[in-house]
Amino acid sequence: MKFFKITTLIISLIVLTSCQGPGVNGDEDRKQVTILGVMIGEQQEKIEQALAPFTEATGIEVVYEGVDTFATTLPIRVDSGRAPDLAMFPQPGLMADFAREGKLVPLGEILTPEEMTEAYDQAWLDLAAVDGTVYGVWYRASVKSLVWFNPQEFAANGYEVPGTWEEMMALSQRLIDKGKTPWCLGIESGNATGWVGTDWVEDIMLRTASPATYDQWVAHDIPFNDRRVENALDIFGEITQNEKMIYGGKVGALSTPFGDSILGLFTDPPHCYLHRQGNFIAAFLPADVDDDQVDIFPLPPIEEEYGLPILVAGDIFAMFNDTPEARQLMAYLASSRPHEVAATLGAYISPHKNIDLNLYPDRLTRKQAEILNKAEVIRFDASDMMPGAVGTGTFWSGMVDYIGGADGTQVLNTIERSWPR
């Protein structure tokens, strides 16, 4: 959706809403929109730059507040009658809770279905929907199904980028046979330790079971200890339960901070040759690593029938207070303009379908965006969609236990018992 088209929509909204009564928690003369979000520091500065053209075009001030306690701060604000006009959710699960409580305005009251599909592929609209109704506008995507490697080391040793899981595991065994370590894995992440392991299992589930089965798993329509989940965990174990597969073995995997685990690709000699992690790990690359020393490929398919799905995360806007200004801002966020601005600033990938790849400032980001754009199947991080007691509780801790050597069946049974009844 081009900016001039959205500008026309914004003008139309001004005319339409000027005839209406006051919006929720607002009034006709209001010239400000408030946002509560998770981006702070440098990321907050970037989103404020992306929002600036809206203020320039409309004269409406956008007040963005970034907090690192979003999941607790937002419910308190809403319950006390001080909801922000818009919230930027780091995952759609919490958004869905507010939607089901009737706290959010459906996007269909602002944009037509045609305008939505012009801006986003159906997969992203499905992820923004709650019980069939779209509520959110996606702003940023994280591409998680990536394997990082040092192309100079591959070229020097005659290694080829694997196109299938079987080829990737054959390369891993080839490295072991030469006395080398295939993988670097670090899952330590403070209070969030374990999420690296959940990402692995989710990615494998998408490659060994249908998207519908994945959705059933997330919704607990199948139990957590279902045989298909156990199969995914077993495949993960082919890497984690083999001390020769990962640098430092189990102890190294459990104790290495996730941001440090990619560093092994660039030591001399390399500590490892493969590292699976999302696009955000680029922020942890050593400053002295040149562009020709790092590359990526999508985590390969396992079962041919399920193709090459991509596991994603992302940030999504939804509207609490139905004011003319908030409607205009939601329309702007669905246009290509804020995404184009953000793309040029780096450390960002847009889920919007109309973003020129040449806007991204570096080769790696363009490649990540291209992988996302080509994906026929995308699914959101499962742990972010599950109840907190599981997704950020027993699923995380279960991965720590499993990597440490616990029996996989027992781990899955423990997680299943923890699911809220």
UniProtKB/Swiss-Prot annotation:
Disruption phenotype: Inactivation of the gene results in loss of the ability to take up glucosylglycerol and sucrose, as well as to accumulate exogenous trehalose. Insertion causes leakage of glucosylglycerol from the cells into the medium. InterPro entries: Bact_solute-bd_prot1, SBP. Keywords: Cell membrane, Lipoprotein, Membrane, Palmitate, Signal, Sugar transport, Transport. A lipid is attached at residue 19 (S-diacylglycerol cysteine). Its main location: membrane. It comes from the Bacteria. It is found in: Cell membrane. It is a lipid-anchor. The keyword Metal-binding does not apply. A lipid is attached at residue 19 (N-palmitoyl cysteine). It holds the Pfam family SBP_bac_1. Coiled coil: none annotated. PANTHER family: ARABINOSE-BINDING PROTEIN-RELATED, OSMOPROTECTIVE COMPOUNDS-BINDING PROTEIN GGTB. The complex is composed of two ATP-binding proteins (GgtA), two transmembrane proteins (GgtC and GgtD) and a solute-binding protein (GgtB). This is Osmoprotective compounds-binding protein GgtB. It comes from Synechocystis sp. (strain ATCC 27184 / PCC 6803 / Kazusa).
